[in-house]
Amino acid sequence: MIKEVKIEEISSVMEIIADAKRLLKKQSSQWQNDYPNQKVLLDDISNQNLFGFFQDGLLIGIESLIIKEDENYKGITLGKWIKKPSQKDLVIHRIAVRNNYHNKKIGDQLIKFAIDYAKRKRIHSIKVDTHKKNIAMQKILLDNNFSFRGIIYLKREEEDNQRLAYELVI
């Protein structure tokens, strides 16, 4: 079941983030600085943007679903968005799954939830980005009919701030 994450679940959220950071460290510099940190995730929770995949009461995976124009997406290179970034985009950030639950299609279920969420909110463009070395995330996006749109550069300071940008128009 996927539902909104509550403040009482922040310790479980941070465990999932720690798992993701360890995994990503093996393949790239993604999430290796102080991001995402507890403040970012608490903001997601307080803004009702953080959703979790729960199984038998255990939080297994998370994603932030944010309806707004993302500043990082304004300067796309080597391609273009199908729909120009706007306040009516659904932007997916911070998808992560507990280590013991990889290869169980949890990421796919989170993406499918995001698509259904966008449809319920009458949003027609879903945007997301990932690191070029995050092959698993790229596969999940392509398997769910997202198309590669180009390259964006994150505004926050990070050693490797280049990201692959994907979009699904519904």
Language-model features, listed with the residues they occupy:
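A short beta-loop-alpha structural element at the N-terminal edge
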Residues: 1-15
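Conserved GNAT-fold acetyl-CoA-binding loop/helix
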Residues: 21-40
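Conserved beta-hairpin
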Residues: 49-67
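Conserved acyl-donor/pantetheine-binding loop and adjacent beta-alpha core of acyl/acetyltransferases
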Residues: 64-94, 102
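Conserved acetyl-CoA-binding loop-helix of GNAT-fold acetyltransferases
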Residues: 94-97, 103-116, 139-143
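Conserved beta-strand-loop-alpha-helix junction that forms the acyl-donor binding cleft
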Residues: 102, 128-138
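Conserved GNAT acetyl-CoA-binding A-motif
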Residues: 111, 118-130
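Conserved catalytic-core motifs of GNAT/GCN5-like acyltransferases
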Residues: 129, 142-162
